[in-house]
Amino acid sequence: MNVRGLGRLMFGFGMIGIGAVSLVCDSYSLQWEPVGSLLPNLGRLSGAILCLGGLGVLIGRLNMLAAAILTVFLGLWVFALQAPQAIAAGGSDWKALSGTWLGFAEDLAMMSGAWTLLALSDQDDNDAMAPWLTDARALRIARTLFGIACLVFGASHFAFSDITATMIPSWIPERLPLAWITGAGHILTGLALISGILARLAATLEAVMMSLFVLLVHVPMIVAGPARDAMQLDWTMLFVALSLAGSAWAVAGGLRDKPWGFGKGARADA
């Protein structure tokens, strides 16, 4: 399985998981889908869209259509739900701002992952869906948006390093410095993806790091048995983390024709 296939697999199962939790709990996806009182009682419809979209991403003949639907649907989360809420909340300092915009960034990264999978699927198809949504420029925009999200991830690791450290398994030493290191990794990845310098290497390392978050942080939480009042949150966090890792692998797959280091043609926007 290549990098792009791994991204599609992880993203698809992540979407199915988020949707399944919404269906079981009959609610929206908590802070990742802050609908509030705008459209009550439609959580299961949202969950069904995510489940079907995730399933479609895994099926060869349907993956382009499914990726398009998820790009639009997650785009609504980002721009219709998260952005207005984050702007209205504001923030008096960078710590408050990073916390306010974290949900926006996580949804933006997942939207970027869906968009990247759409563009990559369309490149393999003889009949282009919409060139302006799937050409090299669109792929570059999706990659840049993922980079912006990574900057927010990094800022939140520093702003809430104490909380981040507690999420790291206790058997891993120096958890607080590790929270800083992973935060720096997010920021460096964001800068690389936005600038196009060392983008393939950065995206791949980001994907590895996010995959380790799934394995070392979120899976053990589930295995340990989440508290009943936190069950929906813990399961949703697991599948969001899986979707984010899948998005990172998809972004890395979109850079497969670029060199790993410096040199001619190394810039992702070249």
Locations of the language-model features?
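Short juxtamembrane and helix-loop transition motifs at transmembrane-helix boundaries
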Residues: 25-37, 160-173
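Extended, low-polarity transmembrane helix blocks
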Residues: 1-27, 31, 41-52, 58-159, ...
